[in-house]
């Protein structure tokens, strides 16, 4: 999992200032990680994007009292909508890894059936890649960036 960038906060820092700094950092983390997930053979790249989105939405929630509510809700809603297709692809990645482990230890008589399941999952994952590309593009969309900038500016 990609580490989040560190944001040093001080106890006397106003909530709005801290919120802006943390949201900006989480937004930059997402922007840096997301492009690497498109077409990656490493399923952890997609997982890292999902974690970065969760960190950003969590920051929006944690600092809610220091942010303009309508702008915060709009940005959060856009993030969740744009990242939703990543969940299906990640689920398939996890299932494929699990079935591959089963296949390695399977009896010869079971291998054909397990291989078929693996092929079906791999096909579904290949189809999901188009949704991953669209989701990553949406997470880099200027409209979302503007919504996050609006939250950080309030």
Which residue stretches match the model-derived regions?
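Function-determining surface determinants
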Residues: 1-154
